[in-house]
Amino acid sequence: MHPYPTCTLVTPTYNWPQALELLLLSVTQQTVLPNEVIIADDGSRDDTRKLIQQFQETFPVPLIHVWHEDIKNRKPAIMNKAIAKAKYEYIVEIDGDIIMNRYFIEDHLTYAKEGQYLYGSRVNIQESLLPELFETKKTQFGFFSKGIKKRTRTL
């Protein structure tokens, strides 16, 4: 067993609960879970808060919602507030529209070293496929899955 560092996952969100839902579902499917997840909310409407509250009822780790009022784009400010609330030694930061591969957190923690910054690339999903993904709640994709653009970034 690998001695993983403790970990906080931080992600921003703003008025796109459908994308946040897929992100949170992908967290629940991780082979190694973060110790907590913090959502940095840049002033989203009430539907985002309600979605987070629904997930909090059954989420496998603490799910913390850090919100501030919507006064134009203040993503850096809300991210700083969210990171300040992190309780664990290692922070993984992802964008709010990311659907993580189930090994994402495990891979991050496997290669975590003090003084080292890890980053990765992402593939894009064709916009025309988003309604289907939001309907089916699909969160796992193969290299040849339909609608994946820039798939060679995964190599």
Specify the residue positions occupied by each region the protein language model found.
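Cell-envelope/extracellular polymer assembly enzymes that use nucleotide-activated donors
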Residues: 5-8, 36
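Conserved short acidic donor-positioning loop in nucleotide-sugar-dependent glycosyltransferases
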Residues: 15, 27, 42-43, 70
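Short, acidic, metal-binding catalytic loop of nucleotide-sugar glycosyltransferases
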Residues: 25-34
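A conserved acidic beta->alpha catalytic loop
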Residues: 41-50, 72
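Glycine-rich, basic loop-to-helix element that forms the pyrophosphate-binding segment
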Residues: 69-86, 103
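Short aromatic/hydrophobic "clamp" motif used to bind/position activated sugar donors
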Residues: 91
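Conserved donor NDP-sugar-binding/catalytic core segment of glycosyltransferases
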Residues: 103-136
